[in-house]
Amino acid sequence: MKGDVEMKKLLPIVAIATLVLSACAQTGSAQGGPAKVTVTMSEWSVKMTQTTLPAGQVTFALKNDGKLTHELAILKTDLPHNKIPARVEDATKVQEIGIIGEIEDVEAGLTKTDVFDLVPGNYVLICNEVSHYQAGMHLAFVVK
């Protein structure tokens, strides 16, 4: 009988502990470091593992599956990803309006990473190597 009373007292404590631990497990990756996204580029495409990212620090890994050198430029802009204006002095590249950062000159077969601090809003990823944007190397994503 005494064991039943002890068990009844223990059950709510175990239930609360389980809820607390599961809540920590769900948010642990966000607290454990930057979110991570892989961007894969090749002639003439850009793919992301996810196109909605959390605000804060995000690790971008640029994987070059192509045969040419590519770069990743992150632009914070409300312009559509296919409407970034060309540079006046060099129409083979686009203006890097609202640039947050970039990972430059990733040669074929290589991967480079960097961490960027993103605030909520609309973004565009581009490859701004000569004529790569015009060939379709751009993609929109959102930070919430």
Predicted regions and their residues:
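C-terminal motif of bacterial Sec signal peptides marking the signal peptidase cleavage site
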Residues: 21-23
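Asparagine-centered strand-capping/turn motif at beta-strand->loop junctions
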Residues: 62-64
